[in-house]
From Swiss-Prot:
Further remarks about this protein from its record: Heme 1 (or BL or b562) is low-potential and absorbs at about 562 nm, and heme 2 (or BH or b566) is high-potential and absorbs at about 566 nm.
Job of this protein: Component of the ubiquinol-cytochrome c reductase complex (complex III or cytochrome b-c1 complex) that is part of the mitochondrial respiratory chain. The b-c1 complex mediates electron transfer from ubiquinol to cytochrome c. Contributes to the generation of a proton gradient across the mitochondrial membrane that is then used for ATP synthesis.
Localization per Swiss-Prot or TrEMBL: Mitochondrion inner membrane
Database matches in Gene3D superfamilies: Cytochrome Bc1 Complex, Chain C
Gene responsible for this protein: MT-CYB
Cofactor: binding comment: Binds 2 heme b groups non-covalently.
Membrane topology note: Multi-pass membrane protein
Organism: Geomys tropicalis
Binding annotation for heme b b566: 97, 196
Name listed for the protein in its UniProt record: Cytochrome b
Length: 379
């Protein structure tokens, strides 16, 4: 008689994805972040669901409904801070996951990689529309500035912005539709994550050496379920420390003031996880040029499979490319810092140099380094 998990139609799917899945025996802790992203998504959907039960998407009551959640709802303060800081945690895991994909050459699984880029764009869209909902001062002005960027699109720009706003400014209609988008998008992300896994399991996982590991694969359970469980516990410890001891550390003080369209904050900026893209946007003095650079800062990732010149897949044995990779990481941290600074010297020139370096490393220096390393190894 066959074991139920191998014969039952539903159990069979779970079995092939999480139990009997053949996995490389040498994947490191950097491979934990895929499962951690799944955990973050579940956490965000659950906390978001409970917040939606008490939130009202109306400009007159949105701010006070969030206050009501924190003051009057049982553990409302905890749910709210878990949801707000859960977004930061989500993006930390997401950026590490993408960084690991670049370092170990996982982008050569083109279908999986492209679905991943789509997931990144959807997650950024979800975070942006969710950011507006509490209707604080920076939330309101952030929404106004970022949506207004679409007016740079020739011919249809202004109409497109007014269509998104539902009027001539960010108002009740905007808040209502942003709430609707924020509610539905995580479920689309969850469905796409399934497709992401489906494509990954077609090819099997990559490994730190970047070489085929078909001859020595091990079952996913119990080896990697245990490893993922350990990663989840460590992540939750970090998360709860942030939520319970420093809940407002990553937020903006301006958001404790209700939105006021007559009073502009001195320095408008998005959440920390968008600052690198915001710095690239600001580094170009032209509005349309800035919007194009902003879009390319994410879409450039889609070119990586076609810019791979090395005969080796991973960066594990390529010191020149490793140096460039860590330069890219340092550059992104620099851009994140610059995005939070006012638009004045010396921050302007630092942002412009860092933005140019970001594209230069990805589009030119890393492919060149791959060719040089091939030459050095006489390949």
């Amino acid at each position: 008689m066959t074991i139920m998990r191998k014969s039952h139609p539903l159990m069979k799917i779970v079995n092939h994805a999480f139990i009997d899945l053949p996995t490389p025996p040498n994947i490191s802790g950097w491979w934990n972040f895929g499962s951690l992203l799944g955990l973050c998504l579940i956490l965000q959907i659950l906390t978001g669901l409970f917040l939606a039960m008490h939130y009202t998407s109306d400009t007159l009551t949105a701010f006070s409904s969030v206050t009501h959640i924190c003051r009057d709802v049982n553990y409302g303060w905890l749910i709210r801070h878990m949801h707000a800081n859960g977004a930061s945690l989500f993006f930390i895991c997401l950026y590490i996951h993408i960084g690991r994909g670049i370092y170990y050459g996982s982008y050569l699984y083109t279908e999986t990689w492209n679905i991943g880029i789509l997931l990144l764009l959807l997650t950024m869209a979800t975070a942006f529309v969710g950011y507006v909902l509490p209707w604080g001062q920076m939330f309101f002005w952030g929404a106004t500035v970022i949506t207004n960027l679409l007016s740079a699109i020739p011919y249809i720009g202004q109409d497109l912005v007014e269509w998104i706003w539902g009027g001539f400014s960010v108002d009740k209609a905007t808040l209502t539709r942003f709430f609707a988008f924020h509610f539905i998008l995580p479920f689309i992300i969850a469905a796409l994550a399934m497709v992401h896994l489906l494509f990954l399991h077609e090819t099997g996982s990559n490994n730190p050496l970047g070489i085929p590991s078909d001859c020595g694969k091990v079952p996913f359970h119990p080896y990697y379920t245990t490893k993922d469980f350990l990663g989840a516990i460590m992540l939750l410890m970090l998360f709860l420390t942030l939520v319970l001891f420093f809940p407002d550390k990553l937020g903006d003080p301006d958001n404790y003031m209700p939105a006021n369209s007559l009073n502009t904050p001195p320095h408008i900026k998005p959440e920390w996880y968008f600052l690198f893209a915001y710095a690239i946007l600001r580094s170009i003095p032209n509005k349309l040029g800035g919007v194009v650079a902003l879009a390319l800062s994410i879409l450039v990732l889609a070119l990586l499979p076609y810019l791979h010149t090395s005969k080796q897949r991973s960066l594990s044995f390529r010191p020149l490319s490793q140096t460039l990779f860590w330069m890219l990481v340092a550059d992104l941290l620099l851009l994140t810092w610059i995005g939070g600074q006012p638009v004045e010297p010396p921050f302007i020139i630092i942002g412009q140099v860092a933005s140019a370096l970001y594209f230069l490393i990805l589009l030119l220096l890393m492919p060149m380094a791959g060719l040089i390393e091939n030459k050095l190894l006489k390949w």
